[in-house]
Amino acid sequence: MLSFLESDYNDIEWVEYYTNKIDTNECYDSGKMSELYYERAKHNYRLGEYLKSNTDLEKSHQLLPNDDNLVSFAFIYEKLGNTKKCLELLNKYKKANPEEEFIKDYINDIVNFGCYDDISKKKFEALKDWLIIENSFLDNIKIKFNTNDNREIISQKDIGLNESILEISLKCMMTTELGKETEIGKEVIDKNLSLYSKHNWISFILLENLHKSDSIWRTYIDILPKKFDNVPIFFKKNYLNMLKGCTCLSKILSKIASLQTEYKFLFNNLETFKKYSLAEYIWARTVVITRIYGVVIDGIKTQALVPFADMLNHNNNPETQWFFDDINKVFKIVSKKKFNVNVPIYDSYGKKCNSRFFVNYGFVLDRNMENTVRFNFDLKSTEVSGLKYKKTFLSNSSNKTHILGEIEQNRNNFNIFLAKARYYVCNDEDLFDESFSTFLVPISIQNEINVLKYIMRMCINHIRKYSSSAKNDLDIVLNPFHKYNREYSNVRNCIIMRYGEKFIYDYYIKMATMCIKLLTRDFEDLIETNLLLDALSGKYHLYVSDSICDLLNTDGKIDKYLFE
């Protein structure tokens, strides 16, 4: 399976390639010429050559009309800043394809972004004025508005190494301690209630100030999203259906149930809380979970919402550092490198699987090497043996499932996964009562072959649960013109989310296929064909060197090959 994670196009070379094809015009029919113009249009789009891309797409469409091209044209006009033309094309597509739910969200997003863009900018200016009055520092940054749900902080000037990117006064930070001073917070303390989440404290501040026109937090609350359409707990059914089979789907449903349980608990136990609706509570909790910082103030660990700082988007290598300056009583973000003017500035939300980014924050990373999937051990599989003797092992629910990423992400975690699989497929009664550590290393060639078959079967069973094939997902995300591939859209995020999981299952199918060959072929054949050497230098080299070579060397064949 080709991974778009590994796809690095040289778009300039591809434009030249398709230009040569078009110019030679080797008696191609209209369908082929349409395809050539379409392909060149895609590469020009990726290069930011939107006018050239538009010209090529028009030629392609004239030769072979296609309704989906209307959305592709809309993408181009959106990039060109022609909102009117963009909406005209999207509405035309919607009229011809009313069943396509996603198109309504595209239209609403563009309409709302246009309507509220100026208003939002004024609100941010008001917030900035308040922060500066309270001794915050924001001279080095400005806000770039991408969509309703996506804004980013960019540099307003050149920023030097170890220079302050921004500083936010403690007076402007919503902290856990302030939450305990709210009316709701005081009642919680008086009644000695145990809250479901520490995030509740700051949620209480938001709720009590939500409708107060004279609140000191007014300018901050005014810029907070009124809706979180990009966060999966608010998704409509059509998006949830796209996530069928995904690990994150159960997390989304669990999150919704958890918030409802929290609300019911607070409503039933606190008089000061009864005035707030479930919708208001979920809004406040979502604000907190999508923006919270864990900070140390005067030596005390606490949590806080920090205006402006909470708009930095995530990057695994942000080249910034944040901390609370106890001397000056400000939250600081400083540079770990020099930044030129007009470049994005990032924070890190930590290394997480896309399912956590998606459920908690409403975004996914195209290139996320921290992705994991859940393996549910299929106890009915033909490879599994002797379950009636393994009841003690089965009594621990954690032994029936395993969260796993690629091998190099966490080698020890992979070895534990293998040990569970080895025990399940083990048919040697003498080993049933052995300690778990026995299975951290291979026990026999036949057992390991059965383990690999078992892993392959589990992967295939998981892949069958998804609502689309991996190839279909890949075709979408590799095509910048595909109607489901609009930047920052929910539909695209769903596709990236599910493809990332399928990629890991496919990763282990390939591992199992290759390693079964290594364990079943003659040793001389492995050497002559370079299968073993290739495996030792490939992406599964840790497993091959740790386990496969250990098994192949039981009679000293590898030692003999290496040292004679």
What do the predicted segments below correspond to?
Residues M1-C115:
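Alpha-helical tetratricopeptide repeat
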Residues D23, D56, S194-S197, P232-K236:
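Residues that cap or delimit alpha-helices
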Residues F75, N108, K186-E187, D366-R367:
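Juxtamembrane/interface motifs at transmembrane-helix termini
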Residues L87, Y116-C172, T176-E181, E208-E564:
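Long, positively charged leader/targeting segments at protein N-termini
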Residues I184-I189, S194, R486:
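Intrinsically disordered, low-complexity polar regions and short flexible loop motifs
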Residues Y196-N200, I345:
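Carbohydrate-active enzymes and regulators
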